[in-house]
């Protein structure tokens, strides 16, 4: 099967890495995967193609904006690939009623915006696939985990970089500010003399974007002055192929997920990617949801507003215990989320 992804490809975004993983494993199962477009010099390992006739399936991967090709390319794709050969992946929960959590994170700002998304999806395909472990809410919806885990990518501690940070967070400030302010910052403030370097790597932690059309300002809302008071470092994002190595430079990595996707029980690549690193992942997730993804051992890695201090300080004091917990989670991921299973699920969904 020849599978062409149509998506906004960015070197510092998880979904580009996820599709790159499929490119790597697809030949083992007799498939070929590429992203629509022309080769980019800064992404040399990504397979690009604009030869639509070479592909028999197309996957439209949507995030938080309706990504459109040029009219000529869009017409070529639709003209060469029948409706039954098109798949939609709804990564950011747009194919849902308007959801607004505590006046903060939301999938749509207005009902009119939601209608535009629904109409666009329905024009392309009969079904909408979602990377969720929640049951479908309607006849057009199909759960498809999509993201997978490859034990071969785990970092060998012997080859890992030196641990120069106590705590690291790798990811953009896109609806993450409240969780960080509520869960992590009080712990750092109370224990600053006991905690070493803390760094946030990603966009918009030091300041929100200034370019027009960046999105709802609430998505970037954050007390950046708190970072200065607590001597927390910031750094621009790294390329997707540097993420695991970067995370391995810290004793602890904090995992956060934007609230609306957590509410919808959507998975993201970071759920799996963080366990490739030589680090202790601590997860700002609902404990039952985490156990459903990672197995029961993950309950020992959960951070809550009330329990974050005890967990973080214990992980710094007893790293070997937490490394054993991480190994339990890795074994669960290898058994239940391997790419052989993921590739089979994707191929089956494209054939159905």
Which residues are covered by each model-predicted region?
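A charged, aromatic-enriched C-terminal amphipathic alpha-helix characteristic of glycosyltransferases
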Residues: 316-350
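N-terminal Rossmann-like NAD(P) cofactor-binding module of classical short-chain dehydrogenase/reductase
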Residues: 59
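Short beta-strand/loop segments at the ligand-binding rim of alpha/beta enzyme cores
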Residues: 83-90
